[in-house]
Amino acid sequence: MNSKFFGLVQKGTRSFFPSLNFCYTRNIMSVSASSLVPKDFRAFRIGLVQLANTKDKSENLQLARLKVLEAAKNGSNVIVLPEIFNSPYGTGYFNQYAEPIEESSPSYQALSSMAKDTKTYLFGGSIPERKDGKLYNTAMVFDPSGKLIAVHRKIHLFDIDIPGGVSFRESDSLSPGDAMTMVDTEYGKFGLGICYDIRFPELAMIAARNGCSVMIYPGAFNLSTGPLHWELLARARAVDNEMFVACCAPARDMNADYHSWGHSTVVDPFGKVIATTDEKPSIVYADIDPSVMSTARNSVPIYTQRRFDVYSEVLPALKKEE
């Protein structure tokens, strides 16, 4: 596997913000209306597949295929699967279900075939990955030819302890990724995070400033954090950056060890929920319209009004280089 896939944006703050030279001055930047929307952003339909998985990996892959085919049949150009879609979610399962990211692996083969057969861009949720003696929570992205075009390892691990609620430590079995991931498609550039990554606004902000029009988050919030934060965070990331945000969850199974909130959701650049569902197995569809981004960014022009000269401590590496 070519290492370039593991985070298409390399570490180093300046490379995250290639066009932010204007941030070093006190002048408010003058930007034309058309430049506020990436030129490569095209309309498309997205399908979020909210799967109910089992302890049988082959069964999970077969079900994913059926639902991806269904989503494509209903006009989806971009399809998203949930976090840890090929395995039960839980630290006790990750080692058992882990695979290397290589062409001979079952999940790689299945996802590649799904993308190729449907001629869609497939954001393959995430799977437990084994690499050099470590385990990662890893997402693969395939293009319509079935080619792997991006891999994202979950950067922020889900370590929480809610009094009277859920206690969970992904770091007991997983290692964190160390790079952001952005991927170019024929519909524009996408940013990618996994579940807990959505709580860190810097990722979406960096992606948006680098021309991403959509953030994709496979995620499995639970019954404590889900009702409080799932939609809230999706809307926050969308309105913070005036971009589209799509969050794809597993369906809820109360007989499983981990209970997913479900509610896969798509939010537009105004922070409006344009498609969602409940906790049951389903497919969520949304038509992504670039003109909505244009309207949002011209109506509330935060892109021309940010004052990095005032809050430059948000970017300590840039400040140091100055």
Curated annotation (Swiss-Prot):
Protein family: Belongs to the carbon-nitrogen hydrolase superfamily. NIT1/NIT2 family.
Swiss-Prot/TrEMBL keywords: Hydrolase
GO biological process, one term: asparagine metabolic process
Superkingdom classification of source: Eukaryota
Protein name: Hydrolase C26A3.11
Annotated EC: 3.5.-.-
Record bears the keyword Zinc: no
Single annotated GO MF: omega-amidase activity
Top-level class of the enzyme under EC nomenclature: hydrolase
Domain called CN hydrolase: residue spans: 44-290
InterPro entries linked: C-N_Hydrolase (IPR003010), C-N_Hydrolase_sf (IPR036526), Nit1/2_C-N_Hydrolase (IPR045254), UPF0012_CS (IPR001110)
Active site: 83, 154, 195
Organism in which the protein naturally occurs: Schizosaccharomyces pombe (strain 972 / ATCC 24843) (Fission yeast)
GO CC annotation, single: mitochondrion
PROSITE patterns named among the record's database cross-references: CN_HYDROLASE, UPF0012
